């Protein structure tokens, strides 16, 4: 066990005499020049208008976003897997159609 005076020694070893009354840029200089200005450019005051990316969305798109937002993690992963499988199947179908077009010579450029 530690001695009764050991606690005081431990506390005195934790005292820091560092002066922290400087401005934060002096304490934590910017590591990547320009990052602060870039981040500040995206801080918009709170307004009633929707963000630019949301202005082009239709009501069906917003409903889909709400639906995806309400899914659990497992359900969302299933949805993503389904989309990946669909994209893969579409790629296979496109490959077959391109091969078919090649054999039918419909993709060749006309000879001059």
UniProtKB/Swiss-Prot annotation:
Entry superkingdom: Eukaryota
One BP annotation, GO: regulation of DNA-templated transcription
Record Pfam families: LIN52
Annotated GO CC locations: DRM complex
InterPro entries linked: DREAM_LIN52
Family membership: Belongs to the lin-52 family.
Oligomeric and partner information: Component of the DREAM complex.
Name the record gives this protein: Protein lin-52 homolog
Top-level taxonomy: Eukaryota, Metazoa, Chordata, Craniata, Vertebrata
């Amino acid at each position: 066990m530690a001695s009764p005076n050991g606690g005081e020694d431990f506390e005195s070893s934790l005292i820091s005499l560092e002066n922290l009354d400087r401005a934060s840029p002096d304490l934590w200089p910017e590591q990547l020049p320009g990052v602060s200005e870039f981040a500040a450019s995206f801080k918009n005051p709170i307004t009633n208008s929707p963000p630019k990316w949301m202005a082009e969305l239709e009501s069906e798109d917003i409903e889909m976003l709400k639906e995806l937002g309400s899914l659990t993690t497992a359900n969302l992963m299933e949805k993503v897997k389904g989309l990946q499988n669909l994209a893969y199947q579409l790629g296979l179908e496109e490959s077959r159609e391109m091969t078919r077009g090649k054999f039918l010579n419909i993709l060749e450029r006309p000879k001059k």
